[in-house]
Design a protein with these regions (language model features):
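Bacterial N-terminal signal peptides
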Residues: 6-15
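Gram-negative and organellar
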Residues: 19-38, 42, 51-662
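Positively charged n-region of N-terminal signal peptides that target proteins for export
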Residues: 1-5
Length: 662
């Protein structure tokens, strides 16, 4: 259930940024055509100002989803320098744009430098503050926390970018650093839980080199890369700073705890692609191979003084993970009305090596050992699609999809001196057909209807597609100043595996449109509703007793609405008003434990998750002169959970700034 709540919180957080934050301002200062300096034309705009925020309610929830604070910022900047005749001395184009510099939680910079026919260099840099207070654990009182920074950057150099012979070189890196808190239960299922502190340190780097050329009219592109990953995060007993105080004194003290779990890996890879166009025939193909190699060790040692007890857990492993993929796509267009396309793809991944797990308990004098040796997955798929435009009024399409997957694994288990091997193999075939029709009864009006039905002989997981069908429809009306579109999609899936069963249905309805009666006035709005209902069989142990024949149920009804109005007064004042609201109505119950079905009350309380988020905003931008604009904006963030009121928040944010051009 925590995964479902986390997924819903991700949707809410994504919606926060689906509506562009009120700052920076979209309007730029300066002359649109720029200023000429010697052989270059320069267009620049910089926006600097003060951002403010006040938060009521759960500050941790606000930080995990919005996180804007107070202070002076370089909210945004844009610089573009172009040579006037395409023959600059050192470069012909230079562009630089930034956002949020000066301690915003989301900072970025993008740069390009190009010299025609000689080189092109692209750079991007981002820094995100990642704050995760573990709000979905312990009813919001969990002892898990991450307060880290993610830094990412990419560098790409292309030599001879306009020629038939190109050379590529690149470098990328990302890192995550900062403090983290977690917890661990020691000395049995009834043992105490202890807080842990971790200094998170994860680094990923990639180096790449490639080339593109043409031979016999075929364009060939290849790339060779090397990836390196290191995670040196460990854990010690937390002495202070635990997010929530431990409930009550611990009956058995923990005198020491130390965990070391380095995880290092490399992944050299090759990528190749070909593209060919022969008039009626179009061909493209791609092939990738990566030879991942990884090694890890987890060494946990805990010692209790009362009663005296020592527990050691050691997990180690090393292995190779070669992955090969390939696809070949063919398209045939014998007439302007008919297109036939076929795609064949192959995916093969193998995990080879040993994973060793051992646990020793000084009180029970027991040792458990588990080996994991091999996992292989091979998938072959083929898709055939046909599109035919009968007339300007209507056309139709049809498709057939087939895939076959083979999964093999090998495990070895040692317990009390006895060793057993557990090989397993599974194969399944997925077949589906799709048909649709396109109608244009009137030039401004278009209609698209389609349906897909599929069956899987042996689904790999309970939630995978078994016997399913999908229905979709879309209608759009487009005029010169007005556009209105509506869509509907319904998915139904029934799956039964050897141990349990699973069924799901979802329906999505949406309508959106925009109207621009005048060049200075625009209205944009939309609404969508997503209904999801899932039910799956579950089996579990409670107090060493097996419970079966029960169901896990989840219901969701998410309504989303957005609207925006832009109005310009005398080409000097820009006004924008916007509103976004996302609400999951759940199943309408008044209390968390008023569930459905025969599952225990604990399960019924997590069958639905009613939550609401809204964010109105207003922004004003006034042109003072050709090189200066004054901006101000306000944005409200409101979030509430119906069954956990302590996790709601209300935030008033805003800014005032000056946009200027040199």
């Amino acid at each position: 259930m925590a995964m479902r709540i986390a997924a819903l919180l991700f949707v809410i957080a994504s919606t926060v940024f689906a509506q562009v934050p009120v700052a920076p301002s979209p309007g730029l200062a300066g002359e649109p055509l720029g200023t000429n300096v010697q052989n270059y034309n320069i267009v620049d705009s910089f926006e600097t100002g003060y951002r403010f925020s006040t938060v009521g309610g759960s500050f941790e929830q606000y930080r995990s989803s919005v996180n804007f604070g107070d202070g002076i910022r370089l909210l945004g900047s844009s610089l573009m320098v172009n040579s006037k005749n395409g023959h600059g001395r050192l470069f012909d184009q230079f562009t630089l744009s930034t956002q949020g510099l000066g301690n915003d939680p989301y900072e970025s910079a993008v740069m390009r430098v190009e010299k025609n026919r000689l080189y092109r260099y692209d750079m991007s840099w981002r820094r995100n503050d990642y704050f995760n207070p573990g709000l979905v654990t312990g009813g919001g009182d969990g002892q898990h926390l991450l307060d880290t920074q993610n830094r990412m950057q990419d560098h790409n150099l292309t030599l001879f970018p306009q020629s038939n012979l190109k050379v590529f070189a690149g470098f990328s890196t990302s890192s995550q650093t900062g403090p983290g808190y977690s917890s661990i239960q020691l000395f049995g299922a009834t043992g105490n839980t202890f807080p842990l502190f971790s200094n998170v340190h994860r680094v990923w780097r990639e180096y790449r080199l490639g080339n593109e050329f043409r031979v016999f009219g075929i364009r060939v592109n290849w790339m060779h890369g090397w990836e390196d990953f290191k995670d040196d995060t460990g854990a010690t007993l937390a002495a202070a700073g635990v997010p929530v105080a431990m409930p009550g004194p611990l009956p058995a003290g923990l005198s020491s705890f130390q965990a070391s779990d380095p995880n290092h890996g490399t992944n050299p890879y090759w990528r190749a692609a070909i593209f060919a166009d022969r008039g009626l025939f179009h061909l493209n193909g791609r092939f990738t191979y990566s030879g991942g190699r990884n090694a890890f060790v987890v060494d946990e040692r805990s010692q209790a003084s009362s009663p005296a007890r020592v527990q050691n857990v050691i997990t180690s492993g090393n292995g190779d993970r070669p992955v090969a993929t390939g696809n070949l796509n063919l398209s045939f267009t014998p007439t302007s009305k008919l297109t036939v396309a076929n795609s064949t793809s192959v995916y093969n991944v193998r995990t080879l090596g040993n994973s060793y797990f051992a646990e020793f308990d000084s009180q029970t004098q027991a040792t458990t050992v588990l080996f994991y040796r091999y996992l292989g997955i091979r998938t072959v798929a083929n898709d055939t699609n046909l599109n035919y435009q009968v007339s300007h009024l209507w056309g139709f399409m049809g498709a057939y999809h087939y895939s076959e997957r083979l999964i093999t694994s090998q495990q070895q288990f040692t317990f009390a001196g006895a060793t057993s091997s557990n090989p397993a193999e599974q194969s399944n075939q997925l077949r589906s057909g799709e048909a649709g029709v396109r109608l244009t009864p009137w030039k401004p009006l278009s209609v698209l209807l389609s349906a897909e039905i599929g069956t899987n002989s042996h689904p790999f997981t309970p939630i995978a597609g078994g016997d399913y069908h999908t229905l979709t429809g879309r209608v759009q009306y487009r005029a010169k100043t007005f556009r209105l579109a509506a869509a509907v999609k319904a998915d139904y899936n029934a799956n039964s595996v050897s141990l349990t069963s699973y069924a799901a249905q979802s329906r999505t309805y949406s309508v959106n449109g925009n109207w621009t009666p005048l060049s200075r006035f625009t209205i944009d709005a939309g609404f969508s509703r997503a209904h999801t209902y899932t039910i799956g069989g579950i089996a579990y142990f409670l107090d060493q007793q097996l419970f079966q024949g029960q169901s896990s149920i989840y219901l969701s009804n998410i309504n989303s609405i957005y609207a925006g109005v832009r109005y310009t007064i005398r080409s000097r004042i820009d006004l924008y008003l916007g509103y976004t609201r996302v609400q999951d109505l759940g199943d309408g119950r008044a209390a968390a434990n008023a569930g459905v079905g025969s599952a225990p009350a604990l399960f019924q309380a997590v069958q639905t998750f009613p939550v609401a988020f809204q964010s109105p905003m207003a922004r004003l931008s006034v042109k003072v002169n050709d090189k200066l604009r004054w901006n101000a904006g306000y944005q409200y963030y409101g979030y509430q959970q119906d069954f956990t009121s302590l996790l709601g928040y209300r935030a008033n944010t805003g800014y005032t700034s000056l946009s200027f051009s040199f």
